[in-house]
Regions:
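An amphipathic, aromatic/His-enriched active-site/gating alpha helix that lines ligand/cofactor pockets
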Residues: 26-36, 54-90
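Short, well-ordered beta-strand segments in beta-rich or mixed alpha/beta enzyme
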Residues: 2-9, 39-67
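Short, surface-exposed ligand-recognition loops at beta-strand->loop->(often short) alpha-helix junctions
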Residues: 9-21
Length: 106
């Protein structure tokens, strides 16, 4: 499992605009090989968000970043004036995974 995260700092008062942009955009992720899940997380501190995507593997994620699906998803609307600066990307390989489904199967 591979996780890609982007942290965002949203300009004060523009949180609704930021969330609406994410809710209304076409992600093109559902049919991408290796894609498993996407979450947009709102932090406790005002204006702090994280987008988190979960992939079968690093290779699946990297293939997506070179795909037309990636380009199409990132061509939609600008967040200029909504963000305080560019997002900060972090990439992680899963070391341990525990979830309710795995526990239920045990």
């Amino acid at each position: 499992m591979f996780v890609a995260m982007n942290s965002f700092k949203v300009v004060h008062g523009r949180q609704d605009d930021f969330e609406t942009a994410w809710r209304t955009r076409q992600t093109y992720l559902q049919d991408v090989p290796g894609f498993q899940r996407f979450l947009l997380l709102r932090g406790d501190a005002a204006g702090e968000y994280i987008s988190l995507s979960i992939w079968e593997s690093r290779d699946a994620f990297l293939a997506w970043t070179q795909s037309e699906s990636f380009a199409a998803g990132h061509r939609q609307g600008s967040l200029a004036g909504v963000l305080e600066g560019p997002p900060n990307a972090k990439l992680y390989e899963a070391v341990l995974v525990e979830d309710a489904e795995a526990t239920a199967r045990a």
